[in-house]
Each structure stands twice: as C-alpha cells, then as structure tokens.
Amino acid sequence: MDELEDGALSNGDNLSLPSAGTESWPTSATPGLPPSLLSTLDPTHLGLPEQLASVTVPIRLDTLSYLLHSALLGTYNLQQSLPPCSCTAQPSHIWPDTVRRPPRRSGQARGGWEVRRRPSRGWGRGRGRGRVWAQSQRGPERAEERERNMAGEPGAGPSTPPVTPPSQDGQKEAGGLSEDWEADY
C-alpha cells in the first residue's frame, strides 16, 4: 500500500496539500512558471523560520469580510485626509482633446435627452393633464379620438368594430380589414 502512495507522489498525480509546517510545495506542481518566479522571497530573508513562512491559517468569512472592510475604509479615510491635487483645484484645466459638457438640468437625462414625465395618476390630479400629455405624445387626432371614446359611458372603452357581412364564399373580405386597421393605426 505504501508503494502505491509513493508511486502516485513521484508521478505528480496526487495534488493534495502538504500539511502545515512540513514540506513545501514541489516545484513540479506548477510547471509553467520558472523557478526564479516561484520563490522570489526566501522565508529566511523575512526573518521567519521556514516552517512559519508557509502556514495556512483558517479564518471565518465574516471575520475576513470585516478585516477587508476595515482596511478599505481606512484607505478611504486616509485618502480623504490628504490635501487635494493642485490640478483639480483649477476649473479651467482641460485636456486638449476633451469637450466640456454643460451641467445637466433637472429635466434632462444622460446624454442631454429631455425627460418627459408622465402625469401622476394619484389623488388630487385632474384628468386634463393626461390629455395634454397624450396630445403632445401622440398628436391631436389621437387625443380627440380618445376624448370621443370617453364621452360615452363612464368607464366604457372603445367600441367594438362593426362586423362586416360575409362575402359570397362565407369568409370575411381581407381587403376591408386591412383598410380599417391602417386607418386606426
């Protein structure tokens, strides 16, 4: 049994982790890197014993998250405490190939597009604003058609289209339907 394990280790098939404090990784485990890049810092140069230089320490994820967050927050606070760069204090400093954009107004989206807000359907708003919006968005003809449809019963939607009489074959005429559709839309 020991011979099988020794054979697997010598072939490089077993990639299990070495236990902490024992032998280090074999250089054949990462064949793509040259040996000079594998161990640029010798553990003895750091002033530590060789066994402590490659110790794996288990850490909980919430603890690691806290440590990383604290380090990032400390870096951010340090950056905020430094004096600002002198080049950002000059508002006229512009790179030659950039164009300054005017500041965005409250009714503009990114890129300078105008933002049209739909009317509120909440309490205290009249229906007149909705018609103004519909007229500006879809043209006066559609707004008038909508007003005619709403003038009937309250809550009544558009009336159903009239049924066309069947032709000689007992089928509806295709030409009549397409003309009505084009007129509506």
Swiss-Prot record:
Residues 11-25 have a biased composition (Polar residues). Residues 26-38 have a biased composition (Low complexity). Its main location: nucleus. InterPro entries: C19orf84 (IPR040606). Residues 139-150 have a biased composition (Basic and acidic residues). Residues 1-38, 93-185 are annotated as: Disordered. GO terms for cellular component: nucleoplasm. Residues 118-130 have a biased composition (Basic residues). Keywords: Differentiation, Nucleus, RNA-mediated gene silencing, Spermatogenesis. GO terms for biological process: cell differentiation; spermatogenesis; transposable element silencing; transposable element silencing by piRNA-mediated DNA methylation. It holds the Pfam family C19orf84. Disruption phenotype: Mice are viable and healthy but show male sterility due to defects in spermatogenesis. Male mice display atrophic testes and the absence of spermatozoa in the epididymis. Transposons are derepressed due to DNA demethylation. It is found in: Nucleus, Nucleoplasm. It comes from the Eukaryota. Protein adapter involved in piRNA-directed transposon methylation by connecting PIWIL4-piRNA and DNA methylation machineries. The PIWIL4-piRNA pathway plays a central role during spermatogenesis by directing transposon DNA methylation and silencing, thereby preventing their mobilization, which is essential for the germline integrity. Interacts with SPOCD1. This is piRNA-mediated silencing protein C19orf84 homolog. It comes from Mus musculus.
